[in-house]
Design a protein with these regions (language model features):
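Terminal (and in a subset, N-terminal) low-complexity or junction segments at the ends
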Residues: 1-174, 179, 183-205, 211-612
């Protein structure tokens, strides 16, 4: 007799059992439970199992109900194993399995997927392997649902070879089987293997597309994430919010505003609700692509906000140089009752640094400690040192570092070294530089920065010692590259590039160079710190990646079009000066995102006020 038939029979005798069909709250559940205890119906395994299925959100209550069942059957044990397998107490699922075996109740193909899921949740390979042996022992090794669970478990635990062996032995594979393998490869960082399997799949569902696109995004292969999204659309698959978060985040990293705007339009056209995660991703995409006003607009339209979304907009305002606005948003956040997190304080302290708001910065720093009880982290100390350095308070910055309860890290010392360059203080630079190269001896950027400071002072013998140190420690400067989006296509430039239009690009650059020289531009070669003649240095600096990107952008866009460039390293002083001149001569606006911040070039000026 089926459980529903038994329940109907019992309900005819006890009408209140009908409540089991309509129970909608935990309070109702407890009332029904009390009734079952008083009427002794709790001893009926069919009734008790129905009650147990309603208590899946509370492991404690489920366990209490189970303790009142005199003769639990397989259905009851499966319910308990399922409830505990998805809870923080996943290990207890195995206790019920062991108890079930002691009662000589054999498992079925429902039992094992939940036990295997518990192993995956805890990333407990040893237990998972033991369950696998039981799968074989009880003859469920050819059940597709059990096999899919094993593939997922091994992949989640990083044993992709074991997952592959189970997958390879499967006599029948469905879309879940393939998707589990794609997901496993992505989680292990084997994105190319994931894509190969993705391409071999006979059928794909939305989950598969989402996993593959997210795999590219998490592996910093943002262009491929965006390209795969375009393929997905062409195949008629409609994305969901999860896919769009990956796509929008990829656009943010690439600085691909055009693609990002079209992604936003896609969200609206397909009637997707902009939830908190997607909304925050859109906000970040706009400010990372240089559209700060649009970022603020999207943020203000969010139906729901949290500390992370507030932190994002504050950080965006900070890196765009809007220090006062960032502090204003922070004050509004606090006024509305949102609790700032450590990342929020990093963002607002950075805003104070970029905005020259030293007094306000220290006020917020003290608030963080005293009002919110947040112990300063290295990032917060770094903001204070940077803030003092930007204000020219180099001695005060050194004293602050000396009083820190922890040793300074490379970014903190690097911030002070950067200030030494701006204020041309070679004495402090040498002292800080030596400390910095002990802390981070493999970071080429700090050697270059120290060398440039020596170059400003004409200390060529010091530069030579830095170069020798780099050779001795096998330090190499990473290749610089710049990205520019034209008509939805991402173009990447680097020195020595073999772009198909390189001849035209160089001729365009010579044309630009000729025009800005007429208004007084002379190549500043101090960033080419090698002790060679000036003509050779100038040739080197004019092949920098952002200059190639600028020339290409001016070739391919109409006059007056804003040109947006993303660079992986800090913009050098010469490129910064050149871009200011070009913005003035051509009446163009350039938005350049480098490793440190955004630079908005207009009418011969930069938003960073020549400090970056």
């Amino acid at each position: 007799m089926s459980s529903s038939t038994v329940l109907n029979t019992l309900r005819s005798k006890h009408p209140k059992l009908a409540l089991l069909q309509t129970c909608s709250s935990f309070t109702d559940l407890k009332i029904i439970h009390g009734f079952l205890i008083r009427t002794h119906l709790i001893s009926d395994v069919f009734v008790a199992s129905r009650l147990l299925s309603l208590s899946s959100n509370s492991t404690e209550y489920a366990h209490r109900i189970f303790s009142q069942i005199q003769s639990p059957n397989l259905f009851v044990f499966n319910l308990l194993i399922r409830t505990f397998s998805t809870s923080p107490e996943a290990s207890k699922a195995y206790n019920f399995y062991t108890q079930m075996l002691r009662l000589c109740i054999p498992p079925d193909n429902i039992t094992f997927p939940f036990l295997i899921k518990a192993s995956a949740e805890m990333e407990c390979v040893r237990t998972g392997e033991q369950i696998h042996s039981h799968v074989v022992r009880f003859g469920f090794h050819n059940d597709v649902y059990v096999e899919n669970s094993l593939v997922h478990m091994y992949a989640t635990c990083g044993l992709i070879a074991s997952a592959g062996r189970v997958f390879g032995a499967m006599s029948f594979r469905n879309v879940v089987s393939w998707t589990s393998m794609v997901d496993g490869y992505c989680k292990c960082g084997l994105v190319d293997d994931a894509r190969e399997m993705f391409d071999e799949m006979p059928h794909r569902n939305l989950v598969t597309w989402s996993i593959m696109i997210n795999g590219y995004a998490k592996s910093n292969r943002f262009e491929e994430a965006v390209e795969l999204f375009e393929v997905m659309k062409r195949e008629g698959v409609v994305a969901n919010e999860t896919v769009m978060v990956s796509v929008v985040s990829s656009c943010a990293h690439l600085g691909a505003l055009g693609v990002g705007v079209r992604a936003h339009e896609y969200v609206v056209e397909n009637g997707m609700g902009v939830n908190l995660v997607l909304g925050t991703a859109l906000v970040e995409m706009y400010w990372r692509c240089g559209e700060m006003e649009k970022a603020v607009s999207v943020f203000q339209e969010l139906d729901e906000k949290d500390s992370l979304s507030w932190s994002s907009i504050i950080k965006g305002l900070a890196v765009h140089g809007h220090g006062h606005k960032a502090v204003g948003f922070f004050s509004e956040m606090v006024r509305l009752g949102f609790v700032p997190r450590d990342v929020t304080f990093t963002a607002v302290l950075s805003a104070c640094s970029h905005g020259g708001l030293v007094e306000k910065g220290f006020e917020i720093y003290e608030m963080m400690k005293r009002v919110y009880g947040i112990e300063p982290r290295l990032e917060h100390y770094g903001c204070i040192v940077d803030m003092l350095g930007r204000a020219g308070e180099l001695a005060e910055a050194e004293r602050f570092i000396e009083k820190m309860p922890v040793k300074p890290n490379a970014p903190i010392l690097g911030a002070l070294l950067g200030a030494c360059k701006i204020y041309k203080n070679a004495e402090v630079a040498e002292r800080v530089g030596n400390m910095l190269l002990e802390v981070k001896p493999e970071h080429s950027g700090y050697y270059v920065l120290l060398s440039n400071i020596y170059a400003c002072a004409g200390k060529w013998e010091k530069i030579e010692s830095v170069r020798e140190m780099m050779k001795e420690k096998l330090v190499k400067k990473p290749p610089a590259w710049s990205l520019i989006e034209i008509d939805g296509k991402i173009n990447k430039f680097s020195m020595g590039d073999d772009h198909p239009e390189m001849g035209k690009i160089r001729r365009k650059w010579e044309e630009i160079l000729g025009k800005i020289r007429l208004v007084g531009y002379k190549g500043n070669t101090e960033d080419a710190f090698f002790d060679v003649d000036e003509e050779e240095k100038e040739t080197a600096i004019h092949m920098h990646s952002e200059k190639l990107a600028i020339a290409y952008g001016m070739m391919k866009t109409k006059p007056g079009t804003v040109i947006r460039i993303v660079k992986n390293l800090r913009v050098c002083e010469n490129c910064h000066t050149v871009t200011k001149h070009i913005s003035e001569v051509y009446g163009r606006e350039f938005i350049v995102r480098d490793r440190n911040r955004f630079h908005h070039f207009r009418n011969g000026l930069c938003s960073c006020r020549d400090y970056w």
